[in-house]
Amino acid sequence: MLGGLVTALRTLTILPIPGKDAVTFSHSLYWFPFVGLLLGALLAALGYVGSLSGWHEFAALLVVLGGIVLTRGMHADGLADVADGFWGGRSKEAALRIMKDPTVGSFGALALSGVMLLKWVAVVRLLSFGLFDVVMAGILLARLVQVLLASALPYARREAGTASAFVAGAGAPHAFSALLFTLALLFPFYTENFPTMLWLLGAALVAGSMVGMVSYRKIGGVTGDVLGAGSELTEVAVWITGALLLSDYLLF
């Protein structure tokens, strides 16, 4: 069982983790929410330390860049590849071929720049109100969405790829367990503000569903790049939602 945790940590972070990987990589999906909580706590702590100076813009930049560093830029790279492939390839084969190209095209650069800017703007707002729990929640819910996408959709490539071993054995038990685990991890932070947790969860599920639907229509399933893009888009959706909940002009 702990092999799944080792695999999840090695896959999702740069942390040097001793131990043996899971024999079946899909077993690591059960641990994705826990790794999301760990990453979220580290980034929230980084944001807190940065905010002590009162310079929330710089603290937010630390959070955004810290997320890239701690994940080896893997999810950000996936977002860029998906943007290039989905909007640059007219057929499934063309999209998959473009996504495999290591260079970043114009669509990828625009998507990456836009998402990172939105993240930064949202995190500035969250940190200025001391909402470190929402920063953490975005990271945690993004890993839940990765499990849901891997469990709900088939692997899109004919040949094996980075995520094929995770997607191959994934199914409803992984999705259901990850959802329950995520709720259990989030609930202690929102016992006095349960509606906020529901809004954040809803934002994550909407973002994940949209990624899944677009990916299924475009390439017939998911790849590692799609899982990475789903993570990035979920983070920004949750953080933007959290920032909007602070607005005096919106009645939630």
Curated annotation (Swiss-Prot):
- Biological processes per GO annotation: cobalamin biosynthetic process
UniProtKB keywords: Cell inner membrane, Cell membrane, Cobalamin biosynthesis, Magnesium, Membrane, Transferase, Transmembrane, Transmembrane helix
Transmembrane regions listed in the UniProt entry: 29-49, 50-70, 104-124, 129-149, 166-186, 194-214
| GO cellular component assignments | plasma membrane
Report the subcellular localization.
Cell inner membrane
Broad enzyme group: transferase
What terms describe the molecular function in GO for this protein? Answer: adenosylcobinamide-GDP ribazoletransferase activity; cobalamin 5'-phosphate synthase activity
> What superkingdom heads the lineage?
Bacteria
> In what pathway does it function?
Cofactor biosynthesis; adenosylcobalamin biosynthesis; adenosylcobalamin from cob(II)yrinate a,c-diamide: step 7/7
**Pfam families from the entry?**
CobS
Tell me its EC number(s), please.
2.7.8.26
Q: Which PANTHER family match?
A: ADENOSYLCOBINAMIDE-GDP RIBAZOLETRANSFERASE (PTHR34148:SF1)
Name the NCBIfam families on file: cobS
- What's its job? Joins adenosylcobinamide-GDP and alpha-ribazole to generate adenosylcobalamin (Ado-cobalamin). Also synthesizes adenosylcobalamin 5'-phosphate from adenosylcobinamide-GDP and alpha-ribazole 5'-phosphate.
What the record says about family reads:
Belongs to the CobS family.
Q: What is this protein called?
A: Adenosylcobinamide-GDP ribazoletransferase
